[in-house]
Amino acid sequence: ICSGLVGSEMCIRDSLNTGPNVNPAKATAMAQAAEEVGFESVWTVDHVVIPQDYKSAYPYSQSRRLGDGTENIDLPDPLIYMAYLAAATTKIRLATGILIVPQRSPVVTAKQLGTLDYMSGGRIDLGIGVGWLEEEFQAIGVPFEKRGKRTDECISAMRALWKDDIAEFHGDLINFGPVFCRPQPINKTIPIIVGGHSKAAAIRAGRIGDGFFPARGSVSYTHLTLPTTRLV
């Protein structure tokens, strides 16, 4: 996970992916053990549904299928999962890796994350992505087109809700305000790490993110990608 994008250093942090672990006792033990041995954060994944038949190509596997064809797996809601782990831990950071932001209302998502950050003592990191599974968007009832632009507006809208005493946002796709949204995050913001494998993702990270999460590739690939984040 790369942060400090406007500087000259890359920071790779010790993090643990929770995977499809929905056994309450095992999930608690995993998070507590990670905290005890010094992991900085645990990361959840996000898919609301996996359509049984889909033509979209999964970009992170040679099979082009999620889970190499084993799509029928537990993928818990990441924010509820993080809330559960927050209650079982005291200092480890809790992150989404990643949250498919354009599938969700930015106002509701900002409220959920603001509440979770406030009640966990400021331990939330928001990894975000634009999504790749068009059929999932169709099932949810959200347009797949313009998801990049929608993601950009969602991030700006959520930042306003977290920071401003009275927030409003007026974009092409997102429009609201003036509104109160309490509680706000402890630090009036939540770190946003942009995930993805494309040049567009790297540019988005440099333009509106606080970090970059290259979703695939070697360390050498990451070193090649990072300069792109600094072009904006």
What are these regions (language model features)?
Residues I1-I12, H223-V232:
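Single conserved hydrophobic/aromatic residue that forms the stacking wall/gate
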Residues S8-A88, I190:
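N-terminal beta1-alpha1-beta2 module of alpha/beta enzyme domains
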Residues R13-S15, L94-G97:
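Short beta-strands and strand-loop turn motifs
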Residues E40, D210-G211:
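Receiver (REC) domain switch/active-site residues of two-component response regulators
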Residues T44, T89, T96, T115, ...:
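Ser/Thr-centric signal marking residues that sit
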Residues Q52-Y54, R64-G67, Y81-A83, I92, ...:
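Internal, glycine-rich beta/alpha segment that forms the wall or movable "lid"
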Residues A215-S218:
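Glycine-rich phosphate-binding active-site loops on the catalytic face of alpha/beta enzymes
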